């Protein structure tokens, strides 16, 4: 079973825009019993490998998150969400599987 943990990355210490704040509120609303964990340079070692270190120094936060998200899920389990993902219902139905991957599709296509 996948643990009730939602992980997200916020490297760079910039203030979160309103969209990100609203998306995180949707996670709290639809998954109130989940632990929501923000990963950043204070609680994640961005010097784990040369790729991440170079990306961090270049302020390429998305590249830092690309590696960190996989490492975090591998180590702690749970669900990783990008900060622009808005939930419209609980994620509980996904927890009984061994794993899954999601992707976005433009609804206009």
Language-model-derived ranges and their functions:
Residues 13-20, 58-66, 109:
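Aromatic-acidic/polar surface patches that form glycan- and anion
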Residues 28, 54-57, 75:
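Residue-identity detector for glutamine
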